[in-house]
Amino acid sequence: MIIGVIGAMEQEVMLLSKQLAKLNIWQQARCNIYSGWLHGKKVVLVQSGIGKVSAALGCTLLLTNFEATLVINIGSAGGLSPALAVGDIIVSEEVQYHDVNVTAFGYDKGQMAQYPLLFPASPSLVALTKQLTEHTNINVVCGQIISGDIFINGGQELYKLKRRFPQAIAVDMEVTAIAQICYLFAVPFVGIRVITDIADSVSHKSFKDNLITVVSHLSLLVSDIIQAL
């Protein structure tokens, strides 16, 4: 088993990379790659950069160069549900684009041409994540995450998202692109995101203020998942 983990930003992968034994670090196509061992398992961790294209590139490297057998996407997200708070962890049951529109050709909003509307996460990885957090004080919510190349900062963008995608509980900029690559390679994936903001008019400030603190909880959870696999 080779476990692939991918995050967009240095802050999102830094703590997990420090846990890897026999660590090798290098760069390819502007992706920072960390290869090592954790809990007796081979782990390849990629810091891809922000956005859908960077995420798709990083995931493709994981699957072609390292033949990862599963992919865990980690990082931050903006909360869309009023029930969510900063520090809550979101586990993707399914993911979808919010900035894709080829409805002129009969597709639904958010559906890429020639692809399904929704990309489901691995049920077993979702179940394992839920199981590992049952007896903790971490609030874990499973549901739909939507992705696009927009940092949602309140206003009309937030209003449009909530109106067009009422089932979505969180928004990010990478996980659906990663899911699409995993779909092409028939490799199981799950997205695990921590809420850093609630996508409102001060979300940029909340994101900066909260990122380092809340990501520490996420790193511990991912380490537990790797141990349990």
UniProtKB/Swiss-Prot annotation:
Keywords: Amino-acid biosynthesis, Hydrolase, Methionine biosynthesis
SUPFAM superfamilies referenced in this protein's UniProt entry, alphabetically: Purine and uridine phosphorylases
Disulfide pattern: none
A GO CC term assigned to this protein in UniProt: cytosol
Active site (catalytic residues): E12 (proton acceptor), D197 (proton donor)
Record-listed substrate binding positions: G78, I152, M173, E174
Pathway membership, UniProt: Amino-acid biosynthesis; L-methionine biosynthesis via salvage pathway; S-methyl-5-thio-alpha-D-ribose 1-phosphate from S-methyl-5'-thioadenosine (hydrolase route): step 1/2
BP-aspect Gene Ontology terms: L-methionine salvage from methylthioadenosine; L-methionine salvage from S-adenosylmethionine; nucleoside catabolic process
Principal EC category: hydrolase
CDD domains listed in its UniProt record: MTAN
Catalyzed chemical reaction(s): S-adenosyl-L-homocysteine + H2O = S-(5-deoxy-D-ribos-5-yl)-L-homocysteine + adenine; S-methyl-5'-thioadenosine + H2O = 5-(methylsulfanyl)-D-ribose + adenine; 5'-deoxyadenosine + H2O = 5-deoxy-D-ribose + adenine
Entry-linked Gene3D superfamilies: Nucleoside phosphorylase domain
EC number: 3.2.2.9
Gene Ontology molecular-function annotations: adenosylhomocysteine nucleosidase activity; methylthioadenosine nucleosidase activity
Family (UniProt): Belongs to the PNP/UDP phosphorylase family. MtnN subfamily.
HAMAP family from the UniProt entry: Salvage_MtnN
Database matches in PANTHER family: 5'-METHYLTHIOADENOSINE/S-ADENOSYLHOMOCYSTEINE NUCLEOSIDASE (PTHR46832), 5'-METHYLTHIOADENOSINE_S-ADENOSYLHOMOCYSTEINE NUCLEOSIDASE (PTHR46832:SF1)
The protein's name in its UniProt record: 5'-methylthioadenosine/S-adenosylhomocysteine nucleosidase
Organism: Baumannia cicadellinicola subsp. Homalodisca coagulata
